[in-house]
Amino acid sequence: MAPEEGDQAMSHEDKAACSSLNTTSSTELFDGAPSSENERLRIRQAAVDAMHHGSPKIDPQIWTDVTSHLSGSTTIDARQRDIFFENLTVHGKGSSLQIQKTVLSALLYPIAYPVKRLMSIVGNKKPHNDRRTILHGFNGILNSGELLLVLGRPGSGCSTFLKSLCGYLEGLDLDPVSEIQYRGVPFRVMIEKYRGDLVYNQEADHHFPNLTVGQTLEFAAHARAPHNQVGNSSRDQYVKSVVKVVMDTFGLSHTYDTNVGNDFVPGVSGGERKRVRTDTIVGMNSIAETVLSRTSIAAWDNSTRGLDAATAVDFVRSLRTSAKLAGSCHAVAVYQASEGLYNTFDKVILLYEGREIYFGPRQGAVAYFETMGWKRPPQQVSADFLTAITNPGERQPQVGMENAVPRTPVEFESYWKNSPEHAELETSMRQYKMKTPLDSSEEIKLDEIKRLEQSNHARISSPYLLSVPMQIRLCIVRAWQRTRNDIPALIATAVAQTVVSLIIGSLFYNIPENTAGLGQRASVLFLAVLTNALISLLEITTLYSQRLIVEKQAAYAFVHPFTEAIAEVIVDFPIKLFRCLLSAIIVYFLANLRREASHFFIYIMFQLTAVMTMATIFRTLATVTRTIGQAMALAGVVIICIAVYTGFTVPQFDMPPWFGWIRWLNPIFYTFEGIVSNEFHGRHFECVEYIPSLSFEQGLSFTCSYVGSIAGERYVSGDAYIAGSYDYSYDHVWRNYGILVAFLVFFYVLYFWLTELIPGTTPAHEVLIFRHGGVLQRLVRGDLERGESIRLQEVKSLASEVHSSKAEQKNTFSWKGLSYDIPVKGGEKRLLDDVSGWVKPGSLTALMGVSGAGKTTLMNVLARRMTIGVVTGDMFVNGRELDASFARNIGYVQQQDLHVETCTIREALRFSAALRQPQSVSMEEKYNFVEEVIQLLGMQNFAEAVIGSPGDGLNMEQRKLLSIGVELAAKPQLLIFLDEPTSGLDSRSSWAICAFMRKLADHGQPVLATIHQPSAVLFEQFDRLLFLAKGGRTVYFGDIGKQARTVLEYLEDKGARHCGPTENPAEYMLEVIGGGTQGQSTSIDWVQAWKRSTEYNKLLGELDILASSPSNGVSADPYMVGEFAMPLLVQFYHVMKRDLQQYYRQPEYILAKFGAGVFCGVFIGFSFWKSDNSSQGFQNVLFSLFLLCTIFSTLVNQIMPKFLSRRTLYELRERPARTYSWKVFILCQILVELPWQTLLGICTWASFYFSVYGSGQSSQRQGLVLLFTVQFFIFASTFAQLVVAAVPSVVLGSMLATFTFLLCLLFNGTMQPPSALPRFWIFMNRVSPLTYYVGGISATALHGRPIHCSNRELRVFDPPQGQNCGQYLAEYLKTAQGTLSNPLSTDQCQYCPLRVADQYLAARDISWDDRWRNFGIFWVYIIFNVIGAVLLYYLFRVLPYIRRNRTQKSRN
C-alpha cells in the first residue's frame, strides 16, 4: 500500500481517536511537529513536569510527536527496522498425538521402550521422527511503519509465526534454510545484540503483585530509558514523564499507588490489571509498549481477547499511530476482527495449517481469493471471509468453480506460490535483498545509536541499555519496594519463626550446666540450626513466583536475570540477619546456652552464614529445574541428606562408608560442628551420676556415667564429651567457618551463573493426548507417518439439526430491579444498579456492555452464583420464585473452562449426564444422548482425547466446545447461560457457536449469552439485547431488530449520531455510550434516557404481567424440585470412580509420592544399616524413626494442591450446578488417597525395615511394624485433608501443616525425653500422635534386645587395691541397671550403664505393653482427622454458602 493510501485509510480512525484534542489537528500530528516552537516548548515543559501530581493530562500523540522531533530524525530513522523472512520453516518437538500415561505404563516404560527400540532395529523400521513442522516456508516483508494482520484459525501456527519473527524460539527449532533479517541485520545478530528492539507480547500477564502500578511502569521506563534523554532532561524526569503520559492515556492515573495484585494479593481490578505489564499497558492494549520499551518491532498474540469491540479498535489505532510517528512495525494476531479494525492494517498474512496461503496488501487479500474462485457471502467482514477460506465446512466456491479451486493446505500453498501476487512478492524480496545486503553497515548504525542510548559502562555488544551496576541498583530499588509493600508477609514470617524459636527454646528451657544437660545442649543446637536452615525452603516458592516475570524482562532486554538475583540477595540480607538474631536470642537464652559474648556472636555468625548458604542452595535447585514439583522433590532429597549426615543423628564414627562422604558436602555438618564446639569447648560440667555411687571416699575408683569422663574426675570436659559422642574438635571451628563461607561463595556464583545460563520454563505447545486404545487408527497414521499435526473434524454442523430428544421449552425467566452490592473498604460498592429483563422461550438474548460494565457479574447473579455481597430484587421462573432445583435445571457455560484434566471428552459428558439428568432416565438413554451431543458438536474424532491442562491437551476452541457440551449433556430444563462463549475463538467457531445457540432458541430453549466483539452478521443472530453501561446500569433492553435497526433507532432517537451503513452496530453502540480505552465523554445520560423511555415502561408492564400470571411451565415432578437429580449412593459411585481414575492417570503424582517414600526409606535404611546392640545403636534406631517422620511434610505438601484443585472445580462449577453433594465430594477426596497411601506404606516399610532391624525378628513383630507404617501414611493423608479442608490457599495450608507437624515431631519423645520436658509442655507429648507411632514401632522392634556397649560407651575405672571389679561393685550391681563386662579383672573395670533395650525405652516412657494401645490411639487420630475434615469443610466452605443463598433469597 502506498504511503498516501495508508494515510487516507487511517484518516477517519485517527480523527476519531484524536477527537479529544483541542489545540492540534490530526493533520498537524501526522505532517510534522506542532504548529509553533512555543507550542512544542509548552508540551515539552509539561512532559518534564509530569511527575507532579495534579498536572494536566498530556495528549500522548502530541507528546510522542514532540519527543520524536526532539530526539532527532536521524536517531529515529536509524532505529527503524523492517522484517524480511524467506523460507521461514519452524519445527516443534514431539508429535501432535500422544497417548495418555498411566501408573502402569510409567512403571513399564523402562522395559517397554528398550524392547520397542530393539524390535524396531530387528524389523529394520525407520525410527519415529520426534519433531513436527509447524511453519512451512513462509516468505514476506514488513516495512517499518506498517501493521501486519495475522489471520488463521486456532492451531494454524499464528503464535509460532509471531514468536519466530521476534526470536522467541524456546521449545522451537528454526530450520537452517530459514532466513530472517531486519533491514540488513541478520537474525542472530539482532537477537544477541538488539533484543530490546524485538518484543513478543503474549496473551498471559505476569507482574509482581506487590508492586504498585506506578512502580511497575517506572521500572520498565528506567530499564529502557536512553542515556541521551529527550531534551537533556534527567533520567528520573524522563521516566516520570513517560509513565504519566502512559497512565493518562489509558485511564490508570488513579491506580498509580495501587498494587497490581493477583488472585491472592489485593490490588487493581481484573480489567485494570489486564492493562498493566512490566513494560507496557495492555488490556486496552495501547501504544504504551512502544513508549516504554521503545521497541522497533512488536508482535501481539491475540491481545484483543476479552476486550469489547470499541476498546479493541482503539488498541489497533494506537499501534497505527505509533507506526506512523516512530516508524515501528507491528504484527498482530486477531481471531475476530471487525471491518473497521481490519482496515487499520497495511498487510495481511493468512495461515492454513502451518502454511502461508497469502501475504500482501490488505486491500488485495479479498480480491485474491475471489479471483481464486471463492464466494464471499453478503455482509461477511473481510477478516471472517479470509479465515473461512481455511475452513472446509464454511468456505463456498463460486458457481462453476467447484472443481477448480484448491482444497487442501498444500494445494492452497501451491496456488499461492504460482500466483502473480507471489511473483510480485518475490520480486520485492529480491529488490529488498539487493537494496539492503547483509553487510555490517546497518549494524554499525545501530551500534552508534545504541552507544548513544547506552549508559557509560554498558558493553556495546550487550542488548541492554543499562550497565550491570545500574541494573543491580534498579533491581535493588524494586526489590526493596516489593518488600516494603508486602509488610504483612514479612511480619507473618517473623512471627512464625519467633513461635518456632519459642517452642524450641522452651522445650529445652534452662538446660542445667552439669552433665544432665549435655545431650540436651546438643539436641537444641541441632534443632536450632536445622529449623533455621530449612525455613529457607520457602526460597523455592519465591523464585518460582517471579520466574516468568524475570524471564520476560530478560527477553525485553530490561535487566539481566542475574542482576535481579543479586538484588534479591542484597535486599534479603538484612531481613535474614534480623530473623537470625531474633531466633538466636530467643533460643540461646531460653535454653541457657553459653552466656559469653564472643561465643554468642560466633553462634550468630555460623547460623547466619548457614541460612544464607541453604537459601542459595534451594534457589539454585529452583533454577536448574523446570517445575516447582521437580524443585520440591530435589529439595526433599537435600533435606533428608542434610538431616541424616549432620553428625548428630548418626555420629561420624557410625556413618556407613557408602554414604559417609555426604557429610563433606553438607554445609550444615560444618555449621553444627562449629556451634557445638563453640558451646562445649573449655567447659567442665559437674557430674550428677557416678559409677559406683559416691557414698564414701573411693579415691580414683569411680567415674562419671557420661561420655568423656575420666576415672576419679567429678566433672566431664566439654571437649572430651563432643570428641567421644560426635568425633568433633574445637580445632575445626574456624576451618569449618572458612569452608562454610566457601560453600556460600560457590553457590552464589553457581546460582548467578545458572540464572543467566539456563532457560526458564518451556512454553507449552498444544498437542492432543488420547486415552490408551481410544485414538482412531487413521489419526495415528496421519500423525506418525507424516510427522504432521492432527487436524480435527471441523465444527461444521452445530446448527444443522438439534437433537430430536430435546423437548420444546415453555419456561420464562424474568428479573426485576436487580442490584448487587459488595463490601469494600469504607463501605459498599454497587456493581449492578436496578437491572430488569427477561429471557423467554424461543429467544436468544445478548448481554453487552463496555469493559467492566458488570456483564459477568449480572450473569452470576442471575445464576445465583455470587459468593460475596448482597443481591436485592426479584427473580422468577414462570412467575414463581426460584426453588432449590433452579441451579440444577439451568446450564451455565462459564468463561473459565474448568474440567478434570485426566478425563476424556466422552467421560466428562457422561459424568454430567449421569448425575444431572433425572433418575427416571436410564443410564443407556443418558449415554446415547451423550453420543448425540458429541455428534452435534463435531467432536467424534477426538471424543476419546484427554482434556489435559491448557497448552497440553485440548486447545482453546475444543475446551469451549466441551464446556458447552457438558451443559447440554445435562439437558437443562429451564435455560442456558453462556458467559463469553466466543472469547478467544476465531470468527468461524464464534459463528458456529452462535448459530448453534440460535438453533437451540428456535427449538424453544431460552438462551442468555454475553458477547464482547460480535460482528454485524453474528449480532443479527440475537433477538434481544440487554445493554449495560459502567456501574452495571441499563442503557437498553429490548428487541434488536433486523440489521439491528430497532436498537439503532432507539439510540439515534435519544441523540446519538447516525450509524453508517458499513459500520458494525456493536462497535457503534459502544462508541456512542462512551466505550473505548479512555471512555470518551458523552453529553447524553443514557441511563436516565432509558428510565424516561417508553421502552422502559413497556418492560415494567411486561414484568408485572409475568409475575402476576404464573404458568404451568414447571413440572411438579419431584425431580424438578429436588436439589440433586440422583441419590447419594449413585453420586458416590460416579464421583469415586472418576477420582480413582484420575489418580491412576496421573503417574507423575503417584510416582513422586512413591519415589519420596521409597527413597526416604532406602536412604534411612542404608544410613542406619543394621544398627548394633550398643546404646548408640538403639539411639540410631530411634533417630531413624524420627527422620522417617520427616517425609510427612513432603506427603502433605503433595496432597494439598491436589485437594485444592479438585475443590476449585467442585465449588466453581459442579456445586453451583448441583451435580453432586458436598458430602460425596469430601468423602471421595479422603477415600481416594487411602489405597495409594496403604501401598506406599507397604513399600516404605519394605525399603527400610530390614535394613535397620534385620530379618531375624518374628513375623508378628514385622507385621505390627508394617501396620504402624501403613497407619502413618494414612494419617498423613487424612491430616493433610483436615488442614486444607477449610483454608483458602496452599500456602496457608502448608504453613499450618508444617507448624502443626513440627509440634508433633518435637514432642514425640525422641529429641527430649518426657521426663526432661518443662511442666508446661508435658501435655504436648501426650497429645502428639507421633508419640504413639514412634513408641509403638520402637517398642515392637527393640523389646527384649540386650545391650552390648561399644568401647566408647563403656565406663572404665580401677578398683581399690586388693579387690577385683566384681568384688568392688558387688553391692552396687544389686541395684544398678547396667552390667559389668570383666568382674574378675583387678584393673580397668568395664561397666555398661544399660543391659536391655527396654531400659533405654523406659527413659522415654515407651513400653512393650503399650504397643497395641498405641496402635489403637493412632487410629483414633486418623478417625479424628476424617471427622474434622468433614466438619471443617462444612463449617467454613458449605455453611457460609448455604447462608449466602438463604440471605439472597430472603432479600429477593
Swiss-Prot record:
GO terms for cellular component: membrane. Signal peptide: none annotated. Pfam families: ABC2_membrane, ABC2_membrane_7, ABC_tran, PDR_CDR. Residues 1-38 are annotated as: Disordered. InterPro entries: AAA+_ATPase, ABC2_TM, ABC_transporter-like_ATP-bd, ABCG_dom, ABCG_PDR_1, ABCG_PDR_2, P-loop_NTPase, PDR_CDR_ABC. It is found in: Membrane. It is a multi-pass membrane protein. The keyword NADP does not apply. Disruption phenotype: Drastically reduces the production of andrastin A but does not affect its secretion. ATP binds at residues 849-856. Gene3D superfamilies: P-loop containing nucleotide triphosphate hydrolases. The chain crosses the membrane at residues 487-507, 524-544, 569-589, 598-618, 631-651, 738-758, 1149-1169, 1181-1201, 1224-1244, 1264-1284, 1287-1307, 1322-1344, 1415-1435. Keywords: ATP-binding, Membrane, Nucleotide-binding, Repeat, Transmembrane, Transmembrane helix, Transport. Its main location: membrane. Residues 19-28 have a biased composition (Polar residues). GO terms for molecular function: ABC-type transporter activity; ATP binding; ATP hydrolysis activity. The keyword Secreted does not apply. Residues 116-378, 813-1055 form the ABC transporter domain. Belongs to the ABC transporter superfamily. ABCG family. PDR (TC 3.A.1.205) subfamily. ABC-type transporter; part of the gene cluster that mediates the biosynthesis of the meroterpenoid compound andrastin A, a promising antitumoral compound. Is required for the production of andrastin A but does not have a significant role in its secretion. This is ABC-type transporter adrC. The gene is adrC.
